[in-house]
C-alpha cells in the first residue's frame, strides 16, 4: 500500500474497532478504594476510571468502553487516546476491570524489547541482534556486568540511554548510587556504541534537513525540538509504522483489535478457536515488524490472557 492508502485504511480501522466490555461495578469499587489512598498512582487510576465510567455505553449485553483515538496527535505518528483511557492505567490493573463477552478471551500481545531492537537493527548492533535471536538481551547484559545489577535495572538503564535520561534521574529511579549508574552506563557504552553513533548521526541529519521521515510519517522540525527528541524520533516513528501495519494485518486475519498501548495490542479471541486465532494474531504482529525492518523479526509474547467468566 502507498502511504495515503495505508493511513486512510488505518483511520477506517480505528472507526470500526469493537468496544471493550468492562465490569462497571468493579470500576466503581476501585474508584472508591483508590481515591482514598495516598499513592499518586492509585489517585491517578481512580481519576481515569471515573472518566471511563462516565463515557460507558450500557445495553443489555453489558457496559462498553470505546476509546477515542487520534491518528495525528503526535510528532512520531503514534496513535494517541484522548481523554480518560485504559492506556494510561498500568497494565497490571486491567484484569480486575475487563469483562470479556461470553465465549471470548481478551489477550494482550506485546512486542518483546521492541525499542532497543529497532535501534539495534538500524545501527546493525550485531551483539544485541545475536542475543535477541538467542533469548533475552537484558539477561545477557546482567551476565555481562557480572550479576551486579538486576534484569529490571539493566532494562531501565538501556531504555534510559535511548531516551537520553540523565545519570542522576536514573539513580533516583532505580534506587542505586550514582557511581553504580555511571559504571553500568560505561559498560553499556562499550556494548551499544553502534546504536549511540547511529542515533546521534540520525539526529544531526534530521536537524540539517529540517524534517524527519519514516516509512509513513514526515515531521517538519522547529527550534523547539531538542536534540534528545530528534535522537529518539526514528525509533518511535518506526514503532508507529509497525503498529499501523499490525492493525491492518490483524484486520486481514479477522482478529478484532480493541486497543493499542505503545507496543502492546489488546485483541478479542474466540474461546472455541483460541489457539488458532492466537497463532494468527502472533503471526500478524511478527509479519508487521518484518515488513518495516526488512525481514528482521521482533518476538511477540502474550502479556495477559483473560477468558470470559460467563457460562
Where in the sequence are the language-model features?
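Conserved catalytic core of nucleic-acid polymerases
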Residues: 143-260, 297-311
Amino acid at each position: 500500500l502507498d502511504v495515503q492508502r495505508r493511513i486512510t485504511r488505518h483511520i477506517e480501522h480505528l472507526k470500526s474497532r469493537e468496544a471493550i466490555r468492562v465490569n462497571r461495578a468493579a470500576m466503581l469499587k476501585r474508584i472508591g478504594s483508590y481515591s482514598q489512598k495516598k499513592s499518586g498512582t492509585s489517585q491517578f487510576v481512580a481519576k481515569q476510571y471515573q472518566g471511563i465510567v462516565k463515557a460507558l455505553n450500557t445495553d443489555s449485553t453489558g457496559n462498553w468502553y470505546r476509546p477515542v483515538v487520534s491518528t495525528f496527535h503526535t510528532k512520531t505518528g503514534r496513535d494517541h487516546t484522548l481523554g480518560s483511557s485504559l492506556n494510561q492505567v498500568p497494565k497490571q490493573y486491567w484484569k480486575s476491570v475487563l469483562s470479556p463477552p461470553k465465549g471470548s478471551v481478551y489477550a494482550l500481545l506485546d512486542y518483546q524489547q521492541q525499542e532497543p531492537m529497532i535501534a539495534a537493527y538500524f545501527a546493525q548492533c550485531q551483539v544485541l541482534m545475536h542475543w535477541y535471536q538467542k533469548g533475552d538481551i537484558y539477561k545477557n547484559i546482567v551476565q555481562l556486568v557480572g550479576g551486579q545489577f538486576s534484569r529490571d535495572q539493566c532494562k531501565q538503564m538501556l531504555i534510559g540511554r535511548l531516551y537520553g535520561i540523565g545519570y542522576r534521574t536514573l539513580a533516583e529511579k532505580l534506587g542505586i548510587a550514582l557511581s553504580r549508574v555511571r559504571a553500568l552506563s560505561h559498560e553499556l557504552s562499550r556494548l551499544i556504541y553502534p546504536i549511540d553513533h547511529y542515533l546521534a548521526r540520525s539526529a544531526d541529519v534530521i536537524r540539517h534537513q529540517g524534517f524527519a521521515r519514516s516509512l509513513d510519517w514526515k515531521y517538519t522540525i522547529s527550534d523547539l525540538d531538542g536534540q534528545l527528541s530528534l535522537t529518539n524520533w526514528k525509533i518511535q516513528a518506526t514503532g508507529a509504522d509497525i503498529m499501523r501495519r499490525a492493525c491492518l494485518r490483524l484486520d486481514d486475519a479477522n482478529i478484532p483489535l480493541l486497543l493499542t498501548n505503545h507496543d502492546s495490542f489488546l485483541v478479542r479471541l474466540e474461546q472455541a478457536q483460541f489457539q488458532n486465532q492466537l497463532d494468527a494474531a502472533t503471526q500478524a504482529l511478527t509479519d508487521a515488524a518484518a515488513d518495516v525492518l526488512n525481514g528482521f523479526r521482533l518476538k511477540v509474547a502474550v502479556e495477559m490472557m483473560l477468558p470470559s467468566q460467563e457460562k
